[in-house]
Structure formats: C-alpha cells, structure tokens
From Swiss-Prot:
There is a cross-link at residue 57 (Glycyl lysine isopeptide (Lys-Gly) (interchain with G-Cter in ubiquitin)). Its main location: nucleus. It is found in: Nucleus. A zinc finger (TFIIS-type) spans 257-297. The lineage of its organism: Eukaryota, Metazoa, Chordata, Craniata, Vertebrata. The gene is Tcea2. This is Transcription elongation factor A protein 2. It comes from Mus musculus. Keywords: DNA-binding, Isopeptide bond, Metal-binding, Nucleus, Phosphoprotein, Transcription, Transcription regulation, Ubl conjugation, Zinc, Zinc-finger. Residues 138-254 form the TFIIS central domain.
Length: 299
C-alpha cells in the first residue's frame, strides 16, 4: 500500500470515528500520522487535515486534542512555505524589457512551473486568475477580514488553500458587482464574513475553501442561500406552519363565544382543532376572530 493510500485509509477511519462519536483507537492513528513524512501534495489529495480537525473539535480527551493541534500546526507550516514561495515568485517575475532569448526562456520556465498538477481534486489553487492589487484602504481592510473568516477553525490548512488569495477573489467579485465601496458594499462584505465564521454553518466555509462554491457565487448569494441546512429546514417548517394556519382559518370551523380575542376583546370567534403531533399528545386549536381577523393557536 502506497503512502497516499495509507493516509487516505487513516482519514476514512477518523471520519467514521467522528460520525459514530467513538474515538477509540484515534490516538494510535494520530501517532501514525505524526511519524509519516506528510507533504503538501498528500495533505491536499487525502484531505486528512479536515478529518483530524473534525476529531479535535469533537473530542474531550486533552491528550488527543493536543496531538491533533500539534499535527495541524506542523501541516500549516507546509502551507505557509508554499504561500511564501508563491509570493516570492510573484515579486520576482521580471517586467518585459527586451526580447533576448535568455529572458524568453526565463519567462517560459516561470510559466511552466505551476503547470504540474498538485492533485486533481484541488485545481483551484493553480487555476484562480490573478487578482488586481488595490490601494483602496477600505477594500484592503475587507480583504483582511475575509481572510480571517476563511481561516476559522483552520479548515484551510486541511484543504491547502491560500486564504489571502481566495479572499481577494471574493472581495474583487463583490466590488465588481456593487461598483463602489458604499454602505451596500460594506453590508455585503459583512454578511459574507458573518456567515463564513458561523460555528453552526461550517459547511458553507468548507464549500468555499474546496471550490464547490466559487468566489463569484459567494459574492452574490443571499442570506437564505448561505444559511445552514438546519436553518433552512427550520425556515421551511415555519413557512409550512404559517400556510397551514392560514388555510385552517379559512376552511370553516366551529363558531363559539368561549374565546376572547386579545386584540379587540370580542368573543365572536371560530376555532378548528387539528392533530399536528403524535396521537397521544393534545390537539392544536386554531382560533380566528370573526370581528377583527386576529389569529392565534394553543395546545
């Protein structure tokens, strides 16, 4: 079994432990990883960093948490080194001055260096277009805050993404869509930051880091689109409940003077009883005031 397959196997076992909430044997797997020479290529292709990070968040074992943090910290250095090389290459790229053969060869080599694919699963690292540099203080500050949001919980280490570059992409897309740095622009950036940092919605941040959601998409998504699956389900249930209440109030019912409207204080009401939960629980009573149209319910 090759090194990549072995690391991928460990990652799968860690994922199962997280799913089952049973970390028995996790320390042995983490020690195996500690003794393995991990490269940035292996980190990106196996996504083992995300598995270790998920285990760290779930565990209450201090020794396990410490070892997981140590691994993530050591892997982060690989990403920092890679980012440093990329920045140095960007600074060292010669400006076009002459048509000499040596300069042409140097340019050709610098263009060819990024070509070898790091992994098929992470093309975004090499295919993102270059972002224009801005001297606008507001835009630069927004890029910094977006970078910090993307770095929440260190998921970027596991994926192997340059957060500074990605945040610049997102900010550039927002700026191009809005056209200036007015309040609309600031509110747009602020909502991206809030949702990317949301501890209850880590899926959004991971999808952005992995490229499943592109910078162009996250730049224009609505709050509803960025919401977590759990919040979407709650909103869906509330919408269904509101529709049902409205329909119940309009489909007949029994007229009574037993209820007093808390809005107009009249007793001219119509009520409907519906079994909305299990059969052994009380029915839900929907009441509508025939005088002012006020609606309420109780169990």
């Amino acid at each position: 079994m090759g090194k990549e397959e072995e690391i991928a196997r460990i990652a799968r076992r860690l994922d199962k432990m997280v799913t089952r909430k049973n970390a028995e044997g996790a320390m042995d797997l983490l020690r195996e990883l500690k003794n393995m020479p991990i490269t940035l290529h292996l980190l990106q292709s196996t996504r083992v960093g995300m598995s270790v990070n998920a285990l760290r968040k779930q565990s209450s074992d201090e020794e396990l948490i410490a070892l997981a943090k140590s691994l993530i910290k050591s892997w982060k250095k690989l990403l920092d080194v890679s980012d440093g090389k990329s920045r140095n290459q960007g600074r060292g790229t010669p400006l076009p001055t002459s048509s000499s053969k040596d300069a042409s060869r140097t340019t050709d080599l610098s263009c060819k260096k990024p070509d070898p694919p790091r992994t098929p699963s992470t093309p975004r690292i090499t295919t993102f277009p270059q972002v224009p540099i801005t001297c606008d203080a507001v835009r630069n500050k927004c890029r910094e805050m977006l970078t910090l949001a993307l770095q929440t919980d260190h998921d970027h280490v596991a994926v192997g993404v340059n957060c500074e570059h990605l945040s610049s992409q997102i900010e550039e897309c927002i700026f191009l869509d809005v056209g200036n740095t007015d309040m609309k622009y600031k509110n747009r950036v602020r909502s991206r930051i809030s949702n990317l940092k949301d501890a209850k919605n880590p899926g959004l941040r991971r999808n952005v880091l992995c490229g499943a959601i592109t910078p162009q998409q996250i730049a224009v998504m609505t709050s509803e689109e960025m919401a977590s699956d759990e919040l979407k389900e709650i909103r869906k249930a509330m919408t269904k409940e509101a529709i049902r209440e409205h329909q119940m109030a309009r489909t007949g019912g029994t007229q009574t003077d037993l209820f007093t409207c808390n809005k107009c204080r009249k007793k001219n009401c119509t009520y409907t009883q519906v079994q909305t939960r299990s059969s052994d629980e009380p029915m839900t009573t929907y009441v509508v005031c025939n005088e002012c149209g006020n609606r309420w319910k109780f169990c």
